Amino acid sequence: QARPRPGPKIPP
């Protein structure tokens, strides 16, 4: 399974 890149999820 391809995991999303780690990082803070900041809504636009």
Swiss-Prot record:
Keywords, A to Z? Hypotensive agent, Metalloenzyme inhibitor, Metalloprotease inhibitor, Protease inhibitor, Pyrrolidone carboxylic acid, Secreted, Toxin
Name a biological process GO annotation. Answer: regulation of blood pressure
The Swiss-Prot or TrEMBL record annotates one GO molecular function as: peptidase inhibitor activity
The tissues where this chain's protein is expressed are given as: Expressed by the venom gland.
What does the record give as the function of this protein? This peptide both inhibits the activity of the angiotensin-converting enzyme (ACE) and enhances the action of bradykinin by inhibiting the peptidases that inactivate it. It acts as an indirect hypotensive agent.
Q: Which organism is it from?
A: Bothrops cotiara (Cotiara)
Name of the protein: Bradykinin-potentiating peptide 12e
Domain of life from the UniProt record:
Eukaryota
PTM annotation (Pyrrolidone carboxylic acid): residues: Q1
Its subcellular locations are: Secreted
Where does the UniProt entry say this protein principally localizes?
secreted
Q: Does the keyword Secreted apply?
A: yes
Question: Where does it sit, as one GO cellular component term?
Answer: extracellular region
Q: Does the keyword Secreted apply?
A: yes
Q: According to its UniProt record, which protein family does this protein belong to?
A: Belongs to the bradykinin-potentiating peptide family.
